[in-house]
Amino acid sequence: DVAKAFAWMHSNIADKDGNPNQIFIAGGSAGGHLTALLGTDDSFIKEHGLKISAIRGAIPISGLMDVSRVGRERRKGIWGDDPKIHRAASPLYHASKDAPPILLLHAEHDTADRRKQNQEMYDTLKKAGHPNVTIHELKNRTHNDIRPNLVGRNDPGGRLILAFLKKHSAHKGSLPKKQK
């Protein structure tokens, strides 16, 4: 459970000299879908006593934004046949101005529908009034090589992520006192 892991980290990071107000989430492919879902649907994080504002920023990489568009057999095996569940599991339908800053990344050679879904997510967030959403298509990348290449020296995607983290990080001052 991604929300449970986030809540644990938020509660325990100060013990390791981390700052609970500086936690960004990121993931690729299925992890990109889960990153976008946690960053847009506050019901998951509320179950753990947190607000969506506890997420400093979200970086979904080549994630699905509308699971109803996955092939029927795969969709049925993961989410069943209920359209209400498909909608609930789709970040696209949770887009709001209250989501944390979001950097959407996808590969030039992702499927056409995956690229389209990421663009639709961007457009939907902008239409909802979200002030801090950006989207980038990484050239000469496929769905499978976009993530490993992010750590390469001078990789364009890696540079975008570093710039996003720098832009949306809180003041670099002292750590907050541990809450009891």
Predicted regions and their residues:
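A general structural detector for well-ordered alpha-helical segments in enzyme core domains, enriched
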Residues: 1-5, 121
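Primarily recognizes the serine-hydrolase "nucleophile elbow" in alpha/beta-hydrolase
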Residues: 4-74, 86-87
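Residue-level signal for short, function-critical loop segments
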Residues: 29, 108-110
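Cell-envelope and extracellular/periplasmic
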Residues: 63, 106-108
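Active-site nucleophile elbow and catalytic-triad environment of alpha/beta-hydrolase enzymes
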Residues: 79-94, 100
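Short beta-strand/loop motif that positions the catalytic acidic residue
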Residues: 98, 104-106
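C-terminal catalytic histidine-bearing segment of alpha/beta-hydrolase fold enzymes
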Residues: 105, 119, 126-180
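Conserved alpha/beta-hydrolase "acid-adjacent" motif
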Residues: 111-120
